[in-house]
Every structure is written in C-alpha cells, then in structure tokens.
Amino acid sequence: MKPLTVRQREILDCIRRSVENEGFPPTIAEIARAIGVSSPHGVREQLRALERKGVIELIPSASRGIRLLARAEEPGLPLIGKVAAGRPLLTEAQVERYCQLGPELFEHKGDYLLRVQGMSMRDAGIIDGDLLVVQQAQEARSGQIVVVRLHDEVTVKRLRLEGALAYLEPANPEFSVIAVDPERQPLCIEGIVVGVIRTRVG
C-alpha cells in the first residue's frame, strides 16, 4: 500500500473513531466538519483515493457507505523534521516519513513525531535528535511540555500559566524563559508532548 497523505490519514482516523465510538461510519458532511473543511467534494476525492489504496470500500447510494477493510492498518505516525517558518506542522511538505509505533508504548496516544533540534529541554530528558511523540491539542494545562508556534517559529517548552500571562520555560539554565501576553502576541499551541524516543546513545 502506498503511504497515506496527512489528509487521508486524518480522514481514516475520523472513520475509525466513528466506527469505534458510534458503531457506524460517518457521513461525508460529518467528515468535512471533523477535519475542518467546507467542501464535501474534497472529502469525496480523498475517500476515492483511500478506496484505490485498498483501505476502505465505498458503497454507492448509502449516506454512510464507507466500510473499513482489513488492509486499513495504521500507516504510522508522520515524522516531522525541520519545520519551515510560517507553515502548518502537519502538511505533506513537512513530513519526512511515517513510523510504526505500537500503541501500548505510551500512556497517551500520539498523533505525530517531531524531531528535536537543540538542547533547551535537556534537563527534562529531551535532547537534540530525540523524537517527541506529540498529541495534537490547541489547549494545555500549566506544567505540561508543549509544542508551540510563536512568531512563526515552532519551539518545545514547558508551559506555565500565571494570571493573564503564559511562560514558556526551558529545561536548561543556558536558555531564557519566554513571557507571552496572549492579548499582544499570538501563542498557538500545536500539541502536548506525551513521549520521547531516543534515537542514539553515547
């Protein structure tokens, strides 16, 4: 099977969740709402692509005419390496490859992997070259390690919320805390770090 695109994986995950939670697949309109697109035409095109790749079967003239096939195994988590300034994280251009990870490895499910650049989170056990397992989220609790976009740059820091301010704290005394007033500058949380994979030792 050819690797799924980010959008196709998102749609496949949406179908799986509906089948697992509701007992039946979603409609095209429900998929469009779930992935944040306004046009059902684009969803239909992606569903046809998923059918060609052998992961679903489309049943004509049925509002919920989608059937998951046995080959619809997890394509793996997208691995994002160097992040281009100003670009959304989960675009096909940002994905290096897909990696298979057993769901039992981490307490919380990850949505993508992010390659660490730099040593600002060293004392939290995160070093240059590590792969972070990240769960997509737009909100986070104080104390969680988050992936955030600030000034079109993506960084990994521990979030501390205090009053109206948000502080992005490194885990290395050689780096400075970043104070953010969300009313003056946008702070976009991209996800919460739920695991770390060390890619080399020594």
UniProtKB/Swiss-Prot annotation:
Keyword Signal set for record: no
Record's keyword terms, sorted: Autocatalytic cleavage, DNA damage, DNA repair, DNA replication, DNA-binding, Hydrolase, Repressor, SOS response, Transcription, Transcription regulation
Pfam families linked: LexA_DNA_bind, Peptidase_S24
GO MF entry, a single one: serine-type endopeptidase activity
Residues flagged as site, Cleavage: A85, G86
Catalytic activity of the protein: Hydrolysis of Ala-|-Gly bond in repressor LexA
InterPro entries the UniProt entry points to: LexA, LexA-like, LexA/Signal_pep-like_sf, LexA_DNA-bd_dom, LexA_repressor, Peptidase_S24_LexA, Peptidase_S24_S26A/B/C, WH-like_DNA-bd_sf
DNA-binding region location: 28-48
EC annotation from Swiss-Prot or TrEMBL: 3.4.21.88
SUPFAM superfamilies: LexA/Signal peptidase, Winged helix' DNA-binding domain
Example GO BP: DNA repair
UniProt enzyme class: hydrolase
Catalytic site positions: S120, K157
UniProt key word Nucleotidyltransferase: no
Function per UniProt: Represses a number of genes involved in the response to DNA damage (SOS response), including recA and lexA. In the presence of single-stranded DNA, RecA interacts with LexA causing an autocatalytic cleavage which disrupts the DNA-binding part of LexA, leading to derepression of the SOS regulon and eventually DNA repair.
PANTHER family named among the record's database cross-references: LEXA REPRESSOR, LEXA REPRESSOR-RELATED
Subunit text: Homodimer.
Family from the record: Belongs to the peptidase S24 family.
Entry protein name: LexA repressor
Taxonomic lineage from the root: Bacteria, Pseudomonadati, Pseudomonadota, Gammaproteobacteria, Methylococcales
